[in-house]
Amino acid sequence: MQLKRYISIFLTLLLLLGASRASAQLDASALMRGQRNSARGGNTLGGMQNGYGSNPYDTGVEGENGEGQPGEQQDSTKKEKKPRKPLESYFFSDSIRALRNFQWTVDRNTNKIKIAPIDTTLALWRLDYPHQHKRLGNNSVGGLGQASQEVNYFERNTSREFTFARPYEAYAYSLENVPFYNMKHPYIWMTYLESGQKRYREEHFEITASQNINPSTSFSVNYKARGAKGKYDRSRIKNQNTAVNFAQTGKRYSIHAAFLHNLIDQQESGGVVGEWAIADTVFEMPSGVPMRLASAEANNLYRNTSFFVKQSIGIPLQRMTEHDFSMADLSAVYIGHLFEYNSWSKVYTDKYATYTDERYERNENGTFKSHTDTYYKEWLLNPETTRDSLAERIITNRLFVQAQPWDRNGVVGTIDGGIGLDLHTYSQFALTDYLTGKYERVKKTAWFAYAGIDGKIRKYVDWGASFKLYPSGYRGGDFDLRAHASFTAFISGKPFTLSGEFSQSATSAGYWMDNWLSNHYMWQNNFGKENETRFNVAFTVPDHGIELGFWQSVVTDKIYYGADCKPAQHGGAVSLTSIYAQKDFNIKGLHLNHRVLVQMSSNNEVVPVPLVSAFLSYYYEFWVKRDVLRVQIGLDGRYNTSYYAQGYNPALSVFYNQREVQVGNYPYVDAFVSAKWKRMRILLKYQHLNKGLFGNGEAFQIARYPLNPGMFKIGISWAFYD
């Protein structure tokens, strides 16, 4: 039998030397079958399609045009080209490896990744604002690149880190969202959109370049520049984001590393002096609308530099043989480490100035009475100008272990555990700095431990749980407990999934909620922990465009920013409920997509939410030329009921609760034509189509911050694979 095996392998190698150039995608299962057949002596002269000869990275050429030359004598001096080693990482399943290109993001705590498709379709192309991509998207203070907050309360970030930069997280790169790529060929993707006249123009430019050095090693560069000169006074913004990353996903060892840089330069308008300036259309040009900080020359400059390296190595608990393509199906232990450096800074400047509201109130004769005021009521450090700077830095080290008892997709797939140490540094002006001549730096150390377990029962059940605890020291007593499960049934080959999640947490106030000193605000607080219990249930049928969701939360001792823009803690419990429904109809190319969210808060003075929010998209999609040019023509509309929406404070960079003006009952409609011509996407869009046509004219999502008026947009996106 051994002799027969060696003869079979020898014949296999001879056939490889004369094989034609391989072009099929790598199928790990087929490769393993080929190895087993070879080991059993089962390969025949004509059966090499299951062996290494189908390696898609073997690009050797034997003939003049790449064809094999059967019957011709081979050059005995020609050096044999060694087949390139295929992608063997346990992170990727056979179906993922078979993709031409794919991307993923890494998990901060565990040895896991999240696969995501590369978006080159028309699905979200017409939504040119990144903060609009998820379900109903975010409420924004204006247009492209500006501060925003999620419509759905349950989708908002609850982290206490870098809270002053949170309004821009839909645009900024971070460890959680930086993409890593695996490409069969070098990949370049460029996007450019612009709108409006030159003096008011919005511009959106992106470029991504990625290349695999070998099947397991990739390098990529991402650069995004989103900004606007602004339709309204003092609304110019530059939002630039850069990510340079490297990934090696080998059979046992993996490393992910990235350098990230975010720069945001935002002029601050402070919002309109009164809603009448937008609703009554008394100004011919948006640039003439009076803003509360127009004369104050207010400005925010944010800078972020981040760098991380995440590594892990696998130790198989079973002997690996030539039949084992990856470690995913073996008992194994993985040991890993994460190092992260993350630093954000903010500089806010302004000067003393007043604004005048010409329609502040009516007198006894019914005529309008004007009122002159200042945006900020306090000038604590300098009565004429402001330059408030602050910075926050975190250096993180995490050591984690992952056990794989049987296989990665087993009933008990992975058991995770880890410990971490966060070194926090905060700096802001303090009164003692008058004596030292430099900003004081406050350093705090937080350490924590965490654990988790995940498993699957084939493709029908997915479950897991996790727990994180800060035992003592800074943030001592904080914890986060989570559990989830999903059940999938297949009817006519289509998945129907019911899923649920439960979480309970106790969270300390962020540093900036307890400590603040600037020209306009000062506080020293000692808040207690915020406690929250959540659960949600969802039912999805992707093939029929159906998603139903239900969220419930009870929050006690909620910490929020009140009407005076200062932090406050509610002494009781607040109950929040959200119900989400999505149904996409497709009638012979006519798409009628509906997303509706109902939210209820037991105390809208603590957690204000609109009762109903909706996003409707109606368009017709068709082929102009089959497999060459596909086109969408339609309308997008957004709406929410009236409520006391949050305001936005530029000096603090936070959203705060207010009870002065209501926002809502205004539809915001866009008309678009989008197309995909081979690898190119094209967009023609008129934003805010209904401006001045219908609606109450109050085009606001955040109190006193008007949305952009009507403007025409044109854009192009092109992918290159070579």
Feature-to-residue mapping (PLM):
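Positively charged n-region of N-terminal signal peptides that target proteins for export
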Residues: 1-6, 25
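Exposed, low-structure sequence patches enriched in small/polar residues
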Residues: 5, 12, 183-185, 294-357, ...
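N-terminal signal peptide c-region/cleavage motif recognized by signal peptidases
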Residues: 19-21
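Short hydrophobic transmembrane-like helices used for membrane targeting/insertion
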Residues: 7-9, 61
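Membrane-proximal, glycine/serine-rich, low-complexity loop/turn segments characteristic
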Residues: 25-305, 315-328, 490, 494-495, ...
